[in-house]
Design a protein with these regions (language model features):
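Bacterial N-terminal signal peptides
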Residues: 12-25
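Second-shell loop/turn segments in exported
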Residues: 32, 87-89, 120-124, 147-152, ...
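Sec/Tat signal peptide C-region and signal peptidase I cleavage site
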Residues: 26-30
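N-terminal secretory signal peptides that target proteins for export/translocation
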Residues: 1-10
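Active-site helix/loop module of the DD-peptidase/beta-lactamase fold
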Residues: 54, 84, 89-93, 105-148, ...
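Active-site SXXK
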Residues: 40-43, 57, 63, 87-114, ...
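Short glycine/proline-rich turn/loop motifs
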Residues: 78-82, 166-171, 243-252
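Catalytic loop of the DD-peptidase/beta-lactamase superfamily, centered on the K-T-G motif
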Residues: 31-69, 193-206, 210-211, 236-366
Length: 366
């Protein structure tokens, strides 16, 4: 999710103070000392250039941690350093978990990718009869996004959110174009609830997070006491400000409302090399660019919950996220079995730039 009122970034003149030394590095595989030093220097330089208070970096190879390290501070006011256990908000990196949950239900025969949405939403507009689950997963359904008038501080009910989505006309005929839509994934979360009887976050907790021992990963709650939770920030006219929170319900939707750490994401990454959660055929389908009705690949290019690209000859599935003073990115070079994750606590930061450059350094160090 990326509502504009929470992402606006003015050209900064204020330099955020952050700890000069990185903390708690975990190194479980051999790596070139030169690459290690170069990555450290690059990350610190980018943090200073982008004015990022804190960053958590994961590099994994063959499903094993190469580097799990914190830089800077998780809380500026208290000067709490970032460490591998520090918990950040996911933003839209959470969409891959939603897509995985839907594919679990597909494998169990409870959901069909070609099913029309009206199978699950009986009171939906007639136009939804032409929209399939597959099209929601790939952002080709014609769904829009949060309108500018959306009140993020109203504590919506799930029913109210669904009625809001249903009331917005489709932007194009389903399956004919690609347009990124948070509302599409929000609707998938409600679909999961209707099919299983379990709230989206509870389904993820039981079927994914518990299965993989992702003990710090969960739905966002500002009310709960969350050990190791980072604070989110934004820059306003060059001055660092605390992020202002949204209503509780808006922090529980399936378009990207999770807490996690890089250590938990390392477990997630390792599981994607196995069939612990899904069959290989299901994962391959998620990581293949979905086709439009004319047989052409969509212009995302997007699969189910993942962007799919070629970067300098290397296949990369990836996603970034933006929400409430946090920016995140995960890049998985699946054929090279290399994964790089960067979690940051500044709205408008560019963690995807960092993950891509760090990956290039490791790919060059073969």
């Amino acid at each position: 999710m990326s509502p504009h009122q929470f992402r606006k970034l003015v050209s900064p003149v204020y330099v955020v103070f952050f700890a000069a030394l990185s903390l708690s590095a975990a190194s479980l595989q051999a790596q070139s000392p030169a690459t290690t030093a170069a990555v450290t220097d690059y990350v610190k330089a980018e943090m200073q250039r982008q004015h990022i208070p804190g960053l958590s970096l994961l590099v994994a190879k063959n499903g094993k941690i190469v580097r799990a390290e914190g830089f800077g501070v998780a809380n500026v006011e208290l000067q709490v350093p970032v460490k591998p256990e520090t918990i950040f908000q996911s933003g839209s990196v959470g969409k891959q978990f939603t897509a995985t949950a839907v594919m679990m239900l597909v494998e169990e025969g409870k959901v069909g990718l070609g099913d029309p949405l009206t199978k699950y939403f009986k009171d939906a507009p007639a136009s939804w009869k032409e929209v399939t689950v597959r099209e929601l997963l790939s952002h080709t359904a014609g769904f829009g996004d949060y309108p500018k008038s959306f009140n993020f501080r109203k504590d919506w009910t799930e029913h109210e959110l669904l009625k809001l989505v249903e009331g917005i006309p489709l932007l194009y005929a389903p399956g004919t174009k690609w347009k990124y839509s948070n509302f599409g994934f929000l609707t998938l979360g409600i679909l999961i609830h209707r099919v299983t009887g379990e709230f989206y976050g509870d389904f993820l907790q039981q079927r994914i997070f518990h299965t993989l021992d992702m003990n710090s990963t969960r739905i966002i709650s500002e009310a709960d006491i969350i050990p190791n939770r980072a604070a989110g920030y934004r820059l306003v006219k060059g001055e660092l400000k605390n992020q202002e929170w949204v209503a509780p319900m808006v922090n529980t939707t399936a378009d990207g409302s999770l807490y996690f750490s890089i250590l938990d994401l390392a477990k997630w990454d390792a599981a994607l090399y196995t069939e612990k959660l899904l069959k290989r055929s299901s994962l391959d389908q998620m990581w293949t660019v979905a086709k439009l009705k004319n047989g052409q690949p969509n212009k995302g290019p997007y699969g189910f919950g993942w962007f799919i690209d070629q970067r300098n000859g290397h296949r990369c599935i990836h996603h970034d996220g933006s929400w409430q003073g946090f920016e995140t990115a995960i890049d998985r070079y699946v054929d090279d079995q290399l994964t790089v994750v960067a979690l940051t606590n500044l709205a408008g930061a560019q963690p995807g730039k960092i993950t891509q450059h760090v990956a290039e350094m490791y790919l060059a160090d073969k």
